Amino acid sequence: AFQACSQAPKSTKPMDQLPSSEAGWKAKLSEEEYYILRQKGTEQPYTGKFLMHVERGYYTCRGCGTRLFKSDSKFDSHCGWPSFDKEIKAGVIKETADLTLGMRRIEITCAKCGGHLGHVFDDGPTTTGLRYCVNSVSLGFEKE
């Protein structure tokens, strides 16, 4: 089992050129970021730094800096991970069927770098009906 590490992120700034190999991603990301973003891992529930985060701004992809969600789309879903009801604009998030762990889910990844973000569910409480359930480790934040 993966043990979360306390290693600080190696970079929080957007990259113009993305790593072209897994070795490049390993050099760019912390061990925990690599596990979640590149190996489709999941952080433990209720441990992420953005779970109770309430500042106004933009949640970005930790892998490439792409803006994914605005803070006004974030809500408390009581699921243990940050939740959002819509992406910042169509096309920044890619959805793929995920049949692992004996469940049928929809995986969400960053459309630019392919980094694993989490999953989207159709049980959201807002008018979109969606709940983008995202690992905090997959996210960065830009203040408004």
Residue ranges and their predicted role:
Residues 2-4:
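C-terminal motif of bacterial Sec signal peptides marking the signal peptidase cleavage site
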Residues 6-8:
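Bacterial signal peptide processing site
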Residues 17, 26-60, 66-144:
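A short Gly-Trp-Pro
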